[in-house]
Structure formats: C-alpha cells, structure tokens
C-alpha cells in the first residue's frame, strides 16, 4: 500500500503517543512541528516537549515556530512537499495558508465526540460534567476551531473512577486506531465525511491553576468530579493553616448535614477527612502536603490531627 509523507504537529504526551504510532507505521513522518521550549520548575530549566524528545530520538527534523505566520517557516514547510499534515494536541491555531499546503489536507485527532467539547480541554470537560461516554473524532481541519467535517469517530466509556490521566490513556489507544484507519481510507479515497451539527456545539473552557482551589459551596458530587478532572494537572487543593494541601482522591458520602457549616470538617479517621459541602459530604482519601509525596489519609491520622481538627471550617 502507498505510504503518505506526513508533517506531524503536536506537543504533549497525548500527541507523542500518536506520533510514535506513525513512526512505527508504514507511513513516513518527514517533519514535526511542536511548541517552543519552555522554562519550568524552581530552577527555570529549559524543558523539551514529549513530541520534541521523541522526534530527536528518531532523527526527525523539528520546527518550533513562535509564529506560524512567519514567511520563512511557511516557505520551508511548503518545500517539504508533504502529502498531509496530522495535528494532535498541538496547542496553536493553524493558519489557513498552512492548511492549504497539503494535497491530502490537514487532519486533527480530537479527544471528544464532536461537536460536544470543542476546544482545548475536552477530556477534563467530559469528566467535570459527568458524561458517561466520550471518544475520538478525526476531522478535516478548516480555519475554525474543531469545526471541520468528521472523517471518523470511536466511542469510549467513562467510568466513575476515571481521572483525566486514566481517560487520556484510554483515548490514546482508540485515537491511534482511528488515525491509522483514516490514513488508510485517505489513500483508498474511501473517507465518508459528516458535517457537524452546529446546534449541538458545546465549548470546553480553558483551565487555569486558580481553578483548582476547592470551593465547599459546590456539591460533593461536583467537587469529586473536579478532583478527577484536574488530575494530573493542575491538581485540586484546599487551604489549612496557610498550607496548600493537594487532593488526589476523594469520594462522595451521600449524607447531607444541614446542621453543619459548609466547609466544616465533620470527621477525621482512617477512612479519610469528611468535609461538609453545600450538598452531601466529600471524603478525602489521598492528599499531598507541600514538598511531600502523595499519601493515604490513614497514614497521617495522628501526625496531622491538628490540621484537621473536627469542627474546623476550611
């Protein structure tokens, strides 16, 4: 079967797993576009994206443009004479001029069942809103965000325990399957395109670190979803004696304590820290103190009891 010459655009781990599948396929990844290197951590060290690391290890030429409209970059991209561009969680809007460079167009692997959850946080949004299913959509890209015709989609169930990390791993598996299938259909010219229903569009919102502070005025159910959706980033937290305490795992206790204040610690034992919310109780099971490892609450019942005194309002 004919192989395609592919330019791949992506940045994160989710992207890198799809790139790895293309590298090991019959197709030819001739170049990669990824985000510029960033400074991170206390030492502000330069960090490479997972896609850049994988590309370096496989000797694939890399572009890291600050500006995708840069003429010099666009000319170099055009000279590659690639058949198709594949975009997976790249993080920047691709200009129309680039979209029009490739004879087979540009395709995007998106982690939702479009048109639900267009935008940058589809996985987190599906968990936050209690969706029972999500999936992968492969779309033909146009100059509007996530609005192109659907070329293929696969559904994936969401469990009540899924975090963004665990759900991402499920979606990577089916995303790779969908991507390779679509590339084969492109070669055979058998893709069936389906327009998105604009009436069903729901946009996902950008997530910021400040959004991770737990608000006890929300229900326990919403807080538990938030904790799963914000794992592994930015990780939900609450304040106790001026300490930022991160929450990695929780559960809902379906009891409402109307005689207790919102945010009040009503129990602290080997099963967790039980905190009253606007509706029902949130039981925190795993947490992390500043600069420390993630631990089960049962392991700090005695040593941290002053932080979690019953009756304390957080």
From Swiss-Prot:
Please provide the record's keywords in A-Z order: Protein biosynthesis, Transferase
Could you tell me what reaction this enzyme catalyses?
L-methionyl-tRNA(fMet) + (6R)-10-formyltetrahydrofolate = N-formyl-L-methionyl-tRNA(fMet) + (6S)-5,6,7,8-tetrahydrofolate + H(+)
Under the heading Pfam families, the entry gives:
Formyl_trans_C (PF02911), Formyl_trans_N (PF00551)
- Cross-referenced SUPFAM superfamilies: FMT C-terminal domain-like (SSF50486), Formyltransferase (SSF53328)
CDD domains tied to this protein: FMT_core_Met-tRNA-FMT_N, Met_tRNA_FMT_C
Q: What class of enzyme is it?
A: transferase
One cellular-component annotation, GO: cytosol
Could you give a GO molecular-function term held by this entry?
Answer: methionyl-tRNA formyltransferase activity
Which residues bind (6S)-5,6,7,8-tetrahydrofolate per the record?
A: 112-115
Which EC numbers does the record give?
2.1.2.9
Q: Which HAMAP family match?
A: Formyl_trans
Q: What protein family does this chain belong to?
A: Belongs to the Fmt family.
Q: What is this protein's function?
A: Attaches a formyl group to the free amino group of methionyl-tRNA(fMet). The formyl group appears to play a dual role in the initiator identity of N-formylmethionyl-tRNA by promoting its recognition by IF2 and preventing the misappropriation of this tRNA by the elongation apparatus.
Q: What is this protein called?
A: Methionyl-tRNA formyltransferase
